[in-house]
Amino acid sequence: MAEPDVSDTNTALKKSGEPGMELENNKATSGAVVTEAGFNTRKLWPDLIKLPSNRWVYSCKEIVDRLGTDPKAAQLTKKKMEKCLMYFYMIKKNLRLFDHTYTAACILFFRYWYIYELPQSLQDCIHLSQAILATACKAMENNRPLDMYVKATCEFMMKDLAQQQRGRQNMDKLKWDVRDKLVRYEKQLLCQFGFDLDLQNPKELIEEIFSGFYRFNRDNIMDEEFKKLFPKILAEARNFIIQAGTQPVSLLCDGYTFTALALLFAGLQYKRSTAPNFRFPRHFFQERFPIRITGPMIVNLFTDYRILEDNFFDLKSNKGDKLEVTNEEVQSLIDEEPTDETVPNPYDYELIKDGVCSQEFLDHTESKLKELTEKIISESLKKRPVIDDNTPKDDTKRVKM
C-alpha cells in the first residue's frame, strides 16, 4: 500500500542541510538574509515550495479489505471509527463549525485510517480526531482558538467516564494532556499526509460551482421551470454529501465526481417521487464539471456505496435500497454528449481571469453588501446602546454596606 508522496518535501529539507547546496529552481535571491556563519534562510525556506499531490481514490474491494479478515478486529476498528465520527459531529455542533469543515474532517479521517490505521486505544483515537478536526478547520478557514478545541474535547471524553472516575479525574491535568496531544498529533498528521491538504471537498465544491457568480453569469440561460425546482435538488444534494461523509465514500472517487453523484441522487429521488419526466438540461454536467459522466460509472459508484454501507456503519442516514439504480434510470436523467476526448476544466484560470460578469450579478452583490452592512450596524447597536452625551452622569459613589 502506497503512502502519500513526501519525497519532494523530504529531498528539499535534506538538501537544505548540506553546506553549499541550493534547492533546485529556488536559488537564493539578492534579498536573502545570510548570517556571518554563511547560513542562508532561502535554502531552508525557499520562496516557493512544491508540495506533492496524491490521488486518494481506491476501489471498493480495497476499502473493504482494509478492515481485515478477523471479524473481531474489524468490529473493534468500526467501533473506534464510529466514536471518532461521533466526536466530529458533537464538536461541530459545540463549536458551531461549517458543514464543509465537518465533511473535510471526515475526508481526512478516512484517508488516515486507510493508509495508517487507527491507534490501539480509544483515547488515542480521540486525540487523533481532535488533530484531524483542527487541521480541517484551518484548511477550510474555519479555525477556532486552541482552548476551545481542548475544552470541547475534554467534555466529550468526560462523558465516557463512569461517575466514580469523573470524580477522581483531575480536569486541569486532563486539559494540559489534551492540549499537548493536539500539538503533537497535528505535527504528526501534516508529516504523514505529506502536507497534502488538497481535499477536493464536495461540500465546498457544490457551493462554488453553484455560487451567485455562476447563477447570474452561467445558469441564467437555463429553463425557467428548471430554475424554480433546482434549489430543492441542490438542498437534497447538500444533505447527501454531509450524510455520505459518514461512510468512506470519499475514498471511492474525487471531489467533483462525489458532487456530481450527489446531484444525480437528488435528481433521481425527485424523478421517482414527484416528476417522472424530470431530466437535467442538456450538457448540464459537461458545462459545470471537469469530468465525464457516464451511466455505467454512476451505477458502479452507487453499487459500491451500498456495499460500503453494508460493511461499515448501520446509520439512520444510510440510503439502503435508494442506491439501487439502473443504467436506464441514469440515462433518462442526464443528456450528455458521449465523447472520448478529455473534458476541459471550466474553472481554468485562463478561462475566467477576465472577470466579466452581468449587471444583474453586480446589483445582486451590492444589495447583499447593503443587507450585511445594516445587519452588522444593528447588531453592534444592540451590544452597545447609543448614549446621549447631554444626559447628566451620576458620579455619586456607592457606599459599601
UniProtKB/Swiss-Prot annotation:
Keyword Transcription regulation: yes
Coiled coil start-end: none
Superkingdom of the source species: Eukaryota
Residue ranges, annotated region (Disordered): 1-25
GO biological-process terms attached to the record: DNA-templated transcription termination; positive regulation of DNA-templated transcription, elongation; positive regulation of transcription by RNA polymerase II; sno(s)RNA transcription; transcription elongation by RNA polymerase II
Molecular function GO terms recorded: cyclin-dependent protein serine/threonine kinase activator activity
Signal sequence extent: none
Keyword terms: Cell cycle, Nucleus, Transcription, Transcription regulation
UniProt-listed InterPro entries: Cyclin-like_sf
Subcellular location field: Nucleus
Entry's Gene Ontology cellular component terms: cyclin/CDK positive transcription elongation factor complex; nucleus
Annotated function: Component of the BUR kinase complex involved in transcription regulation. This complex phosphorylates the UBC2/RAD6 ubiquitin-conjugating enzyme (E2), leading to monoubiquitination of histone H2B and the silencing of telomeric-associated genes. Also required for histone H3 methylation. Necessary for the recovery from pheromone-induced growth arrest in the cell cycle G1 phase. The kinase activity of the complex requires the presence of BUR2. Overexpression of BUR2 interferes with mitotic chromosome segregation.
Subunit structure comment from the entry: Belongs to the BUR kinase complex.
Protein name: Protein BUR2
Source organism of this protein record: Eremothecium gossypii (strain ATCC 10895 / CBS 109.51 / FGSC 9923 / NRRL Y-1056)
